[in-house]
Amino acid sequence: MEFNHKSVMLYEAVESLNIKPGGIYVDATAGGGGHSFEIARRLHEAESSSAEADIFEKSDAADAFDKRNTHSGKLICLDRDPDAVQAARKRLETFSNATVINVNYSQIDEAVKQLNIDEVDGVLMDLGVSSFQLDEAERGFSYHADAPLDMRMDKQGKSAADIVNNCSEQEIADMLYKYADEKYGRRIAFDIVKARQEMKIETTGQLSDIIASAVPAAYRKNHHPARKTFQAIRIAVNEELYHLETGLAKAFELLKSGGRLSVITFHSIEDRIVKQYFASLCQGCTCPKDFPVCVCKNTPKGRLLYKKPLIPAKEETESNNRSRSAKLRTIIKL
């Protein structure tokens, strides 16, 4: 199965990690291996350049040449999607220092410890759904095709159909508000419950039609009316925000001093979580201003690489419209 996906902000993301010889890096959301490949390539390039320099600096050229062919740097790639793991392994097969593991990035600490690694130099998280997952109709992520209503990244747990057919009207409305800021959430939830009383909702086409009929005609002009609802259900199915909050904390904990955590977000809800978490790590004393001395003992644990998030270049958004909402944030551990 061909895993076609164009990595968003490829060079900006990899550049933010500051790849260095002998470094240990984690691509926590490997997908088809686009970012992973570039990290592995730069790691190989950095180590080769370092070894070349040794040849000229050291009298024992043979020893330096041996070091050039022994790569101490490592790349660990994680993904919860078995199809993505298979694609990443194929993409990275030429890099002996790359390891691909089928696991959710919220378990990054366990995955790294399995390899007897205690700390890393950098972690990258790309929170977007891959083009492969969106375009492969049978995965049930897309509202552009009629397919089984699934949306599971790893084929475990409840599917989108389970949620749509079993959650109460209030639960569905709350989900649409919390995970997508859908202003017509109550209308949509009402119509979903009404429709499922007549026939079980089993396909993306059914759900998309129900949503389209629930919202005003004006709402259907600029964007597909099902866009936000599908986002909210996908987030709920895969417990994305729980995994994000857990993964962020574990990834930062794994970093060496000077290590970097870079995260690419695609919607305001996940970006808010990343922004607030990074801000909490950068915060120093929280004592009231009128306290003569600090009693909280709180010191900053990190600093932002950029004050504001990076966004894709115009050329990228024009060639890949799925990159339009992307934001890249990076924090450096102190």
Predicted regions, residues:
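S-adenosyl-L-methionine-dependent methyltransferase catalytic core, i.e., the SAM/SAH-binding region
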Residues: 1-334
